[in-house]
């Protein structure tokens, strides 16, 4: 069964974008705003559940030698994360804000790694993962994103792949958003402040029925 939250009472919101786009900052700002109106769970993938830290370390640490190993670990992480964190929160009447979800798998594994689109697109439905009502894409030019990543230091396995890889992923995200405009909100980032970006996201979420 797919859990899809409708009607604005409870929403499952996912935040997407290439590394360095500012998802974590926006997740924090959104959860602060939502917590003033009710219960909210802030989480992330990979690793957003008890026991997930080891999986996160494996997929981001660069130790895996085969792209399918990477994919299967992401799906394992998502299955446990959904069962242990996302679904219980939604059933308890809480909003859920998640940094990265199944669209990350499509963007990174399909556009980034060249894996087949159709089987992976249907994996979430086949597994019965909760379906987000709204997905926000923080759209940023890869050159700017990588410059931000470089300032942070110690890039992970994906951040180390370079500009061409990030360009493919950015293209993938834009294609996914264009194919499902009802679910997606696209926020252009560029050199804008976090407050400006949040204000645009907030307008988009209100337009999708989220009381903010």
Feature locations, PLM:
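A glycine- and Lys/Arg-enriched "phosphate-lid" helix/loop adjacent to the NTP-binding pocket
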Residues: 104-171
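Hydrophobic anchor at the beta1->P-loop junction of P-loop NTPases
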Residues: 15
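Walker A (P-loop) ATP-phosphate-binding motif of ABC ATPase nucleotide-binding domains
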Residues: 12
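P-loop (Walker A) phosphate-binding loop of NTP-binding proteins
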Residues: 18
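Hydrophobic positions on the alpha1 helix immediately C-terminal to the Walker A/P-loop
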Residues: 26
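Conserved lysine of the Walker
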Residues: 23
């Amino acid at each position: 069964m797919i859990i899809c939250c409708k009607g604005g009472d409870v929403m499952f919101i996912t935040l997407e974008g290439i590394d360095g786009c500012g998802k974590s900052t926006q997740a924090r700002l959104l959860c602060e705003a939502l917590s003033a109106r009710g219960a909210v769970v802030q989480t992330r993938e990979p690793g957003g559940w008890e026991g997930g830290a080891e999986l996160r370390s494996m997929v981001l640490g660069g130790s895996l030698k085969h792209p399918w190993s990477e994919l299967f670990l992401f799906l394992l992480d998502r299955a446990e994360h959904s069962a242990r964190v996302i679904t219980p929160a939604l059933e308890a009447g809480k909003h859920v804000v998640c940094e990265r979800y199944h669209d990350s798998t499509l963007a990174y594994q399909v556009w980034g790694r060249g894996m087949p689109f159709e089987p992976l697109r249907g994996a979430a439905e086949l597994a019965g993962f909760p379906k987000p009502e709204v997905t926000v894409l923080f759209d940023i030019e890869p050159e700017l994103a990588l410059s931000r990543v470089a300032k942070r230091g110690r890039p992970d396995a994906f951040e180390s792949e370079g500009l061409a890889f990030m360009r493919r992923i950015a293209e993938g995200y834009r294609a996914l958003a264009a194919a499902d405009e009802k679910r997606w909100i696209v926020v252009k980032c560029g050199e804008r402040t976090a407050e400006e970006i949040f204000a645009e996201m907030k307008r988009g979420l209100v337009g999708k029925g989220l009381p903010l």
